[in-house]
Amino acid sequence: VQVGNDNANSATLTIEPGTTVFGKSGADFLVVARGSKISAVGSANAPIVFTSVNDMIGTSNDTSAGQWGGIVLLGKAPTNKCDAAALASCKIEAEGNAGPYGGDKPTDNSGILKFVQVKYAGYEVIKDNELNGVTFAGVGSGTMVDYLQVHNNSDDGVEFFGGTVDVKHLVLTGNRDDSLDWADGWTGRVQHVLIRHNPNNLEANRAIEADNQSSKFTATPVSNPRIANMTIIGNTFTSAAADSEGI
């Protein structure tokens, strides 16, 4: 499902508190294009849940992951994948061929995610190219993200590609690759973060992967997020093949 087209036919997807949205396969994922918004505002007693049909019929378990795609927000905030002089026309393709992102609007607004859970996502769209639970690609600081959980994603829990978006109250549990990942000039803030690796899954990887830009280490803006009040609970595996480190 795509909300709007790239900088055209802008739309806002509104999801009511207590709603459950489910995907049937890896081809099912939600993309909010540049210029459009999502308004997913749940509550502590009525969160909005994005999950798989397997979860709905009770066949998901503690090791389930990758049963549907995930959520991708595409914004118009800066990324160092584009030169500063060309930010206004920046157009970078997001992971999973989800669409273009980037621009010269650091305060860009892609909507609201509040009291939202994302479970059992991260399908491998093409070989070695999985979707994250939530992908923030060029998402601006006008976007509100508060009380977000990503559970049992087969790739990263959340990943930031450039942008300036802030996140508060972030819970990342049982994700198989990095729980919190950023690259390409993300300069947002994260506060109140809990990361817990699945103690029974050898595929659990690092809690954090932090990059600037893989092809140009000195690219600006340099990735420089601020993180406060974080707890990381790693695994206790001792085999050489297992990743037991918190970071």
Task: Please annotate each region the language model reported.
Residues 1-247:
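Beta-strand/loop edge motif enriched in small/polar residues
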